Amino acid sequence: PAYTTSAGWLGYSDEKLRALCQASLEKGWSHFKIKVGQNVEDDIRRLRIIREEIGWDRKVMLDANQVWDVNEAIQYMQQLAEFKPWWIEEPTSPDDVLGHAAIAYAIKPIGVATGEACQNRIIFKQLMQANAISFCQIDSCRMGGVNEVLAVILMAEKFGIPVCPHAGGVGLCEYVQHFAMFDYICVSGSLENRLVEYVDHLHEHFYHPVVMKDGRYMPPTAPGYSISMKEASLDEFEYPHGQAWST
């Protein structure tokens, strides 16, 4: 299972927001993530439009990208609670364990999700021990390799916290689908409350891009991690020698 971010970016007109929601519904999406945190009145307006378009039987998640301090996060989320968000992602600084715990306690039943900026198992362990997160968002490129990611997946299972990999980057959708499959097949055996982020751009640079159907990742059929980039893309964009950097 996956969630889409296509309608969630800041700065869209009401018409574009409605059109993106409708297009996502036609493709079978049932989970939508929305950026928030710059202006509460504007976020209320956007969330009202989104709920009008997708209804109340589909899930909405919010993402603040670390913009608040702890008290701001609590007060802001109290104003958005009427829209029944499933989680608030990165409400504050990613290494503020006790701050996340305070937010999680104050805004229940809304969950707290974080992890894309966490570099190792230690910070994840502290977040889990403090009951600071309801969703564990590993980032396969931020952390120290596959073994570090697997350690966090195993810890999350021990604490009963679903793993929802972060995939907002070049090739991350292709990469993290394999970790989600490992979690399901080898660790948790469950898809309940487990989602993989899907960002609908830059897949054309890979030989084996992800395949989506009705809001879900389809299992990859080629060997490897699905992240081999096309030679033309490397020639164009590799830093600092790519053609894109020489103009």
Give short role names for the model-derived ranges:
Residues 34-174:
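Catalytic core of soluble alpha/beta enzymes
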Residues 1-60, 65-74, 78-82, 202-247:
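N-terminal capping/lid subdomain adjacent to the active-site entrance of alpha/beta enzymes
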Residues 21-24, 97-98, 125-126, 181:
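A broad, low-specificity signal for short, low-complexity segments enriched in glycine/proline
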Residues 143, 150-247:
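Structured C-terminal cap/extension of enzyme domains
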